Amino acid sequence: QLIMALQTIPSRRLSPQDSAVVSITQINGGEAINVLPDTVVLRGTFRCLSNRVRARVRELIESYVATQPQVSDVQGEISWFPGYPVTKNHALQAQQVREVAAATLGAQAVRWNQAPSMASEDFACMLEACPGAYFWIGTDGETPSKPLHNASYDFNDALIGPGVAMWVGLVEKQLPAA
């Protein structure tokens, strides 16, 4: 019941304009198939597109866990591990990435104003400390490849040149000519 309740937070407790994902990714409890375990450990993640929604989701998770004893005679406690903040690009740096990408890879290769992603990214910490922009270089070749974070993922070596060219272009744009 708790898992189902937690996963309905985005659809039932948030505004449709407030994107969020709640995922229970591990359930561990007991060793024997015919004995109810004393404890069960649930682990998971949640991701949002704003710090306001992040705080609300955390509040709702705490509320759901706190009310479980009333519903199913179980006790719950939460151990929070710091996740990454929301990844938010700065406008000027994002525009510079767009310009360099168009000049380096060709305007047809640049996809701008894509829908926000629920990816979790440690680069978000850098963006909180200083202006910058996070961007993706697509990994597909002529045919779609396995997605990142997949055991079958195989890096497309043909991307090394375009990737290096992007970084060189960004460095040249940022540093004055000597």
Identify the role of each PLM range.
Residues 3-178:
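Metal-dependent amide/peptide-bond hydrolase catalytic core
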